[in-house]
């Protein structure tokens, strides 16, 4: 009886390696697609909200936030909607870099930490300007309106520049060493880092094109371009081979146990 039960159990047991490979393939598609959706939402939100520049006058800031209140809030909402998609992509990127880097995973950890820190800095900088727009900029003291706009600009440009550079440089090094993705992504990453350095230098400027690290908005645009290229190349590349599970031998072991 036990022998017959063991034989049936061994026959019914699914090939876990096959199901694991299918799950990995689905995850390989979902991660990059989520990244592209997140970047699309963030870009659309930025273009819709059109937050005032650092060199704008206080009157211009109040006028834009008050007159285009619904448009600004819609854009800000899209920027926050992007976060769950980008976090999903980050979980995929962590797995990709951890497999490519090997046992140490120092750069994979740095990538995850810098991306999360970048999200926190940008989101925190948008909270105050969101509150001002929601309340109505015309009823908020002008000094507070300007303070909120300046915080959003600083968080988006100069203050987030160091972690933005780390979020690109760390995965670029792994990609260059492992060739997990095309190496030209690393070269593109160096251009992004150069833009981040210019953003950080703008922290010491209160006037001109690079005030508060604005630099005509080139820094965030380059980061989005690099992240989009990363998502597209990851989606186009085949999923990395999953390790064969040791549980595939469980069927024969159960069969032998039943016979004995």
Label the model's feature ranges.
Residues 2-260:
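Hydrophobic, aromatic-enriched alpha-helical segments typical of multi-pass transmembrane helices
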